[in-house]
């Protein structure tokens, strides 16, 4: 419990100092890239994903795997989460002995803080702006779970810091969203330094159809690959289903359960 409190405090400190993606990282956002959209206050989310190997750092995975994560939104501005990504030794090429039967998981924290809401202060042109961090610390024998050495090829596989902005526009056909972000990390095996941009479209014709709440189509460049896909919301926004073609050819998909605690 003490280690958890230390790690959680470190995460909040990092959020106040630094500006990872998103459905595939079990948090709010687009497919691979972050956005500045937020969940309602008190929203608890459970996310499960299938991830192709091209979505994963090469130093940890040479195979496709699964991940699951939890997140909670406070005060409509702060989202914190915890994500686990499965290691499967039987899928490592040439693995023998103990390595072949190893079944473990990588664990990391994430956090996002919305510093500006869309249209805040009565300014209709104002975009929403979010600062975020994913996998900010790693474990070591001397420092517990507060070691900040997350660069290179070691632990801290999913490390990223980012700032994202989002603006929505209503049209006669549906809602259009424009998303810009800048991401930074110190990884050698998962290099995402640079700008990211995305466009979303939620057609009005697919809103509020039986149990279907909406379908949001997404095209994005996440600073590494160009991705397309969609996120469908059903049953009064309790469930979301995600399908993605990373680099327009590699498949990721996921399912999310959302619970309002307020």
Language model features with spans:
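Outer-membrane beta-barrel "beta-signal"
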Residues: 108-115, 197-199, 247-262
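Cleavable N-terminal export/targeting peptides
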Residues: 1-27, 262
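A generic structural motif
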Residues: 75-77, 225, 248-250
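Histidine/lysine/aspartate-rich catalytic loop segments that bind and position anionic ligands
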Residues: 156-208
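Transmembrane beta-barrel domains of Gram-negative outer membranes and organellar outer membranes
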Residues: 20-161, 166-170, 205-207, 215, ...
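Active-site beta-loop-alpha junctions enriched in small/polar residues
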Residues: 85, 134-136, 181-185, 222-224, ...
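Outer membrane beta-barrel transmembrane domains
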Residues: 193-244, 254-256
């Amino acid at each position: 419990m003490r280690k958890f409190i230390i790690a959680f405090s470190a995460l909040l400190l990092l959020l106040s100092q630094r500006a990872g993606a998103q459905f595939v990282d079990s948090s709010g956002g687009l497919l691979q890239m972050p956005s500045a959209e937020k969940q309602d206050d008190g929203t608890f989310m459970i996310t499960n994903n299938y991830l192709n190997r091209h979505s994963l750092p090469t130093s940890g995975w040479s195979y496709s795997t699964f991940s699951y994560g939890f997140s909670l939104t406070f005060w409509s501005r702060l989202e914190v989460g915890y994500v686990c990504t499965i290691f499967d030794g039987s899928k490592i090429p040439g693995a023998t002995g103990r390595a072949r039967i190893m079944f473990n998981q990588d664990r990391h924290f994430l956090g996002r803080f919305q510093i500006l809401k869309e249209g805040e202060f009565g300014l209709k042109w104002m975009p929403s702006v979010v600062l975020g961090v994913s996998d900010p610390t790693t474990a070591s024998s001397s420092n517990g779970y507060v070691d900040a050495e997350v660069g290179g090829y070691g632990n801290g596989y999913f490390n990223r810091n980012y700032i994202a902005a989002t603006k929505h526009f209503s049209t006669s056909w549906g809602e259009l969203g424009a998303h810009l972000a800048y991401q930074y990390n110190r990884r050698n095996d998962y290099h995402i330094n640079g700008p990211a941009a995305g466009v979303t479209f939620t057609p009005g014709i697919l809103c509020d159809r039986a149990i279907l709440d909406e379908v949001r189509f997404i095209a994005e460049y996440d600073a590494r690959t160009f991705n397309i896909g969609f996120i469908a919301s059903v049953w009064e926004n309790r469930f979301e289903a995600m399908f993605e073609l990373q680099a327009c050819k590699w498949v990721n998909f996921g399912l999310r359960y959302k619970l309002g605690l307020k």
